[in-house]
């Protein structure tokens, strides 16, 4: 009787199950390693992007803070008009249309002193805004606002001579030859046109007008509402009332262009020393960028507003902005880390000597804690702290260049 040979082709059921289990284990391990690698890459790339964003923000903010008061003629502040209400800064002109304005419509310029009656609004080179900002969701405290003011050294507006000043206009002329006081920033070979598209005056700009009244120097700050070219290097700059920042008040008894009225020559020529200079009043504050889907509270965003121009976002995801200031009290005592810059004690903002950035905090907008690089799930956060010298606030130019 013949012997039947067993069929050895294929796998048994047990062998098939074992091979499937081993294959699933190998593939699962590979997928897990790949997922961990992707998560680690995401965390690292997100962290690098946050660092880059914060570095760019810090460069812009810290440079502005270091320029506080640069080029301003007075170390004691510049008086502003108040007959039609106090001028404002920050959150304008789009405050009403956008949420989280503190207070609604803008922040009024501070008085010369907290106890001054009546209030004389004054522009300083540095204006602290302690707890005048929004409260970011999840934060226990209000954020701060900070405003710095300095002159524009690129736009050669001081090279123009003033031909006439009325209550609402200033007429300037480009002289030939240029006066000795005309300083051009390289590579400029001639002053730019007053209405030049890139650097010229536009509505919302602030102009510092200096002249002489009764033998005494006088300074007025006005907001540009229009610029017209008259030909031959002659321009009419309009400072009409009802401006965004409430700077133009023709009927004010002080600190308005009405007190500087002069020209045209030869009947009532303007002083040869009269000049115009553009200044930058730059405010930083936090604002909640609305959720495009209208679902969440929005994204906390650091905003930057220059003069009366539309505010622009600097960086999204900034959740805290706080400052303190080192200054001197009325008796000369050193006050360290004061939130309001000593304003509540009657101290002038021009006595501030150091700006302390207590918190400039940025947070990731998407959870980045997805790998072993982070101990718990959550958001990545960076907090910047530094101090900046306010060296220009106490500077006074004792040397006047004759025209």
Predicted regions located by residue number:
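Solvent-exposed, flexible loop/coil residues
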Residues: 15, 42, 54, 176
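N-terminal single-pass transmembrane signal-anchor helix
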Residues: 7-34, 46
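Glycine-rich, histidine-containing beta strand-loop boundary motifs that form or position
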Residues: 20, 28, 37, 69, ...
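Autoprocessing Asn-cyclization modules and mimics
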Residues: 119-247
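N-terminal secretory signal peptides that target proteins for export/translocation
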Residues: 1-6
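Short linear sequence signals and composition-biased patches located at protein termini or domain-edge surfaces
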Residues: 8, 39, 45-49, 53-60, ...
């Amino acid at each position: 009787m013949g012997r039947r040979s067993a069929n050895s082709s294929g796998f048994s059921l047990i062998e098939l199950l074992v091979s499937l289990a081993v294959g699933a284990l190998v593939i699962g391990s590979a997928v897990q390693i790949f997922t961990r690698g992707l998560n680690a890459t995401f965390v690292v790339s997100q962290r690098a992007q946050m660092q880059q964003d914060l570095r760019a923000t810090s460069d812009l903010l810290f440079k502005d803070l270091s320029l506080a008061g640069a080029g301003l003629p007075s170390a004691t502040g510049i008086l502003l008009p108040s007959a039609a209400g106090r001028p404002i800064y920050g959150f304008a002109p789009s405050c009403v249309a956008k949420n989280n304005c503190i207070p609604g419509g803008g922040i009024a310029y501070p008085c010369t002193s907290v106890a001054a009656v009546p209030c004389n609004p004054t522009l300083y080179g540095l204006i602290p805004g302690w707890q005048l900002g929004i409260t970011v969701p999840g934060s226990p405290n209000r954020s701060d606002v900070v405003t710095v003011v300095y002159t524009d050294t690129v736009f050669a507006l001081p090279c123009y001579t003033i031909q006439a000043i009325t209550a609402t206009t200033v007429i300037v002329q480009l002289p030939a030859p240029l006066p000795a006081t005309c300083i051009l920033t390289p590579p400029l070979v001639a002053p730019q046109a007053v209405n030049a598209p890139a650097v010229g005056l536009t509505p919302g700009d602030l102009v510092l007008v200096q002249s002489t009244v009764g033998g005494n120097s006088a300074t007025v700050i006005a907001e540009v509402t229009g610029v017209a070219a008259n030909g031959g290097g002659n321009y009419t700059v309009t400072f009409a009332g009802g401006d965004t920042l409430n700077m133009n008040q023709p009927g004010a008894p002080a600190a308005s262009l009405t007190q500087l009225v002069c020209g045209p020559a030869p009947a009532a020529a303007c002083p040869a020393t009269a000049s115009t200079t553009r200044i930058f009043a730059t405010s930083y504050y936090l604002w909640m960028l609305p959720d495009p889907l209208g679902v969440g509270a929005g994204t906390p965003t650091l905003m930057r507003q220059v003069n009366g121009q539309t505010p622009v976002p600097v960086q999204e995801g900034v959740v805290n902005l706080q400052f303190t200031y080192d200054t001197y009290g009325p008796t000369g005592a050193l006050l360290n880390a004061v939130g309001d810059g000593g304003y509540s004690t009657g101290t002038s903002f021009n006595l501030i000597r150091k700006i302390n950035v207590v918190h400039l905090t940025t947070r990731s907008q998407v959870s980045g804690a997805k790998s072993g690089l982070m101990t718990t799930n959550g958001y990545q956060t960076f907090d910047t702290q530094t101090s900046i010298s306010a060296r220009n606030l106490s500077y006074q130019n004792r040397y006047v260049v004759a025209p």
